[in-house]
Regions:
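Surface-exposed acidic/polar loop and edge beta-strand patches at domain peripheries
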Residues: 1-103
Length: 103
């Protein structure tokens, strides 16, 4: 799917794919069904820019830098720094039919 690292989890009801780049949910697919999430054909999946599509982590603001109460100034990206940061997986467990992960 990409040139960036991904983490996958599968439970009886579905499968998911997450990348530590932006802690971004790339895919959620119920078993025997199509992917529920949209990922742009123009998405760059090499870690050089924010991913277009899926479910991004928007932090500390949503929108352009002008929407941030702190007014971060020129060079600040849309939706904050979180979606272009590489996150580290701290824990992963799989009790019963759940698949939680902590970033």
């Amino acid at each position: 799917m990409s040139d960036i690292a991904t983490l996958s989890a599968t439970v009886p009801s579905s499968s998911t794919q997450i990348t530590p780049f932006g802690a971004h949910l790339l895919s959620w697919r119920p078993t025997d069904e199509e992917d529920v999430l949209w990922l742009s054909s123009r998405a760059v999946l090499d870690g050089t820019k924010a991913i277009r599509g899926g479910v991004p982590l928007c932090l500390p603001w949503f929108g352009g830098p002008e929407d941030s109460p702190s007014r971060p100034g020129p060079g600040a990206g849309a939706h904050g720094f979180a979606r272009t940061s590489t996150w580290k997986l701290l824990a992963s467990t799989q009790p019963a039919n759940d698949a939680p992960a902590s970033f």
